[in-house]
């Protein structure tokens, strides 16, 4: 292994659920969501992930959590839109400026957000705080996590109510497709150095702890999704910009689970690496073909941001791909390039695959939020199944997540304003 990286012997790890519990209380949801309609029993996965190297590893646990509030996310971008498409309004950095509507100015925001002909934007809701991630529950209501640690539940009219609170920077939430339980990925503490991220189930506590964290606030356990195989999947960010350990100029042994997509049983056991080399996968999503996609924030000094269709067992590049000053890969390592790229510093965050039939011609289109205030971002990008990509919606301050609702509409969360926008199809 070159450039001072410590070799790690590849030995599979099988996590064992701890039987220990503590009396420390966990945040309790104000009310359980409606029970999900039972689905068929999950089938075993056919993909074989890579062996997990030995080293410091997270462990499943039944320790109850007592999370506390905290912190801040990343940003997204895209190529030229099709002719006649949307045009980006001027960016303004503060609430109620001459270019930036007040957060409560519904009419001004609805006029500002641009969408293609045939679509309509509605100011659906606003939550108190900075949204980081969203999920629809089995009750078909929208749940929104904010940076300060609260998860809100919005009623059908968009009125938010606190559902559960006390987490430290929750950046991933997902409902189990059979049990309806809410899974939360968050930090364990606020510190960036020697930090830790965890996965919890609301009203039950932590099921995985000791996950690597943190290069910045959002290099942690982030987006969660349940796969068609019944397993849980989570993206975990790297602990460095381009391979060096935080606070040094040297590359050291990579944590076995950093910069990777992990797969786990729904009780937190049998954690394994599904794919490697994703520097900071803020969100993940399954498409209609059964492929798993991840947004990826590239190193800070300028390479393009990335979007990957994940290949089980593959090495997707970090910390080696498209980086002249980075450490070079060991001999024999095949690095897969990204499937799509965005402009540098766009900060791709949320992703969803459109698998509804409400938007005509959009089935299996990927929608990606570009969170950054850098030129070319602050947008929702469409990536079509035939490979086209363009700005689908513009005018946001910092769009951080996008999701398809049970009604077939898109919902976009703006981190800077706390506004949740609804994009619906009304016809040409």
Identify the function of each model-found stretch.
Residues 141-144, 181-185, 231-235, 291-295, ...:
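Conserved beta-propeller blade signature
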Residues 170, 188-226:
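Asp-box/WD-like beta-propeller blade repeats and closely related beta-sheet repeat scaffolds
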Residues 123-128, 162-167, 208-216, 273-277, ...:
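Surface loop/turn motifs at the tips and blade-to-blade linkers of beta-strand repeat domains
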Residues 151-182, 186:
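Blade-loop segments of beta-propeller domains
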Residues 6-91, 428:
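Ser/Thr-rich, Proline-interspersed low-complexity disordered segments
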Residues 127, 137, 176-178, 227-229, ...:
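Structural WD40 beta-propeller signal
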Residues 71-116, 238-272, 279-280, 284-390, ...:
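Beta-propeller domain segments
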Residues 134, 173, 224, 281-284, ...:
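Hydrophobic core register within WD40 beta-propeller blades
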């Amino acid at each position: 292994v070159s450039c001072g990286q410590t070799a790690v012997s590849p030995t599979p790890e099988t996590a064992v659920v701890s039987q220990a519990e503590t009396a420390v209380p966990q945040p309790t949801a104000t009310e359980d969501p409606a029970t999900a309609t039972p689905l068929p029993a999950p089938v075993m996965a056919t993909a074989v992930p890579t062996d997990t190297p030995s080293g410091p590893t997270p462990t499943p646990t039944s320790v109850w959590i007592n999370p506390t509030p905290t912190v801040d996310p990343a940003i997204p971008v895209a190529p030229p839109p099709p002719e006649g498409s949307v045009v980006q309004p001027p960016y303004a950095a503060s609430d109620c400026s001459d270019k930036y509507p007040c957060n409560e100015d519904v009419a001004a925001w609805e006029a500002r957000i641009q969408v293609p002909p045939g679509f309509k934007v509605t100011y659906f809701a606003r939550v108190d705080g900075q949204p980081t991630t969203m999920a629809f529950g089995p009750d078909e209501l929208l749940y929104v996590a904010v940076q300060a640690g609260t998860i809100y539940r919005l009623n059908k009219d968009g009125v938010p109510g606190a559902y559960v609170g006390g987490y430290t920077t929750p950046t991933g939430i997902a409902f189990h497709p059979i049990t309806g339980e809410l899974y939360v990925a968050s930090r364990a503490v606020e510190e960036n150095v020697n930090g830790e991220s965890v996965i919890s189930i609301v009203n039950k506590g932590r099921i995985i702890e000791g996950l690597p964290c943190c290069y910045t606030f959002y290099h942690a356990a982030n987006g969660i999704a349940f796969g068609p195989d019944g397993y849980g999947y989570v993206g975990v960010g790297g602990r460095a910009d381009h391979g060096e350990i935080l606070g040094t100029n040297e590359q050291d042994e990579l944590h076995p689970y950093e910069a990777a997509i992990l797969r786990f049983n729904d009780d937190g056991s049998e954690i394994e690496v599904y794919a490697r080399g994703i520097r900071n996968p803020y969100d993940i999503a399954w498409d209609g073909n059964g492929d798993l996609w991840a947004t990826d924030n590239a190193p800070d000094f300028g390479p393009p941001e990335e979007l990957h269709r994940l290949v089980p067992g593959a090495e997707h590049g970090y910390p080696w791909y498209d980086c002249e000053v980075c450490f070079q890969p060991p001999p024999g390592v095949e690095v897969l390039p990204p499937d799509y790229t965005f402009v540098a510093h766009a900060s791709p965050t949320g992703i969803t695959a459109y698998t509804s039939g409400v938007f005509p011609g959009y089935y299996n289109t990927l929608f990606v939020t570009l969170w950054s205030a850098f030129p070319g971002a602050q947008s929702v990008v469409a990536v079509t199944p035939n490979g086209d990509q363009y700005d689908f919606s513009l005018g946001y301050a910092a769009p951080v997540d996008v999701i398809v609702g049970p009604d077939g509409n898109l919902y976009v969360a703006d981190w800077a304003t706390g506004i949740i926008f609804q994009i619906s199809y009304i016809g040409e």
